[in-house]
From Swiss-Prot:
It catalyses: 4 Fe(2+) + O2 + 4 H(+) = 4 Fe(3+) + 2 H2O. The gene is bfrB. Its EC number is 1.16.3.1. Homooligomer of 24 subunits that are packed together to form an approximately spherical molecule 12-13 nm in diameter with a central cavity, in which large amounts of iron can be stored. Fe cation 1 binds at E22, E55, H58. This is Bacterioferritin BfrB. One of its GO terms (biological process) is response to nitrosative stress. Disruption phenotype: A single deletion is more sensitive to oxidative stress (cumene hydroperoxide but not plumbagin). A double bfrA-bfrB mutant grows 40% less well in the presence of an iron chelator, is more sensitive to oxidative stress, has significantly reduced pathological effects in guinea pigs and a marked reduction in its survival in human macrophages. InterPro entries: Ferritin, Ferritin-like, Ferritin-like_diiron, Ferritin-like_SF, Ferritin_DPS_dom, Ferritin_prok.
Length: 181
């Protein structure tokens, strides 16, 4: 077997980085979900456990894309995540910041694919761009609702139970290596 020489293109290298970012995001959402569970906020906990699975699935979609293109994949470790929050709004604000960062990362991936003439890579990233619009909008809404609810966390929980859909991945989503959880 020959020794791995690293990514073939800048897009491939950024895809490897994004796999790391998505797995780290999944772990961060588990930490946020556990925080909400510890605060007896079951609706928020349920939502963030679901978000963690979604982020894991995103990582595996990236893996599958690279495998489909006969490119080597390295499964990375994850960064340390934040576990302590003073109040629910703080955890929600972190999630919003994280989604905005991911949006920037996905935009950069798409631009690099275009710059390199990687039309397959650019087309693949289009689904992720649309997904990020939805994710940022939802997290921004949750932060606003938390601000309005103030100390009345029951209102925030009611909003999540009533308005936040824990739905399966949208049709047209890329396949995830090993299947979606």
């Amino acid at each position: 077997m020959t020794e791995y020489e690293g990514p073939k293109t800048k897009f491939h290298a950024l895809m490897q980085e994004q796999i790391h970012n998505e797995f780290t995001a999944a772990q961060q959402y588990v930490a946020i979900a556990v925080y909400f569970d510890s605060e007896d906020l079951p609706q928020l906990a349920k939502h963030f456990y679901s978000q963690a699975v979604e982020e894991r699935n995103h990582a595996m979609m990236l893996v599958q894309h690279l495998l489909d293109r006969d490119l080597r994949v390295e499964i990375p470790g994850v960064d340390t995540v934040r576990n302590q929050f003073d109040r629910p709004r703080e955890a929600l604000a972190l999630a919003l910041d994280q989604e905005r960062t991911v949006t920037d990362q996905v935009g950069r991936l798409t631009a690099v694919a275009r710059d390199e003439g990687d039309f397959l890579g650019e087309q693949f990233m289009q689904w992720f761009l649309q997904e990020q619009i939805e994710e940022v909008a939802l997290m921004a809404t949750l932060v606003r609702v938390a601000d309005r609810a103030g100390a009345n966390l029951f209102e925030l929980e009611n909003f999540v139970a009533r308005e936040v859909d824990v739905a399966p991945a949208a049709s047209g989503a890329p396949h995830a290596a090993g299947g979606r959880l």
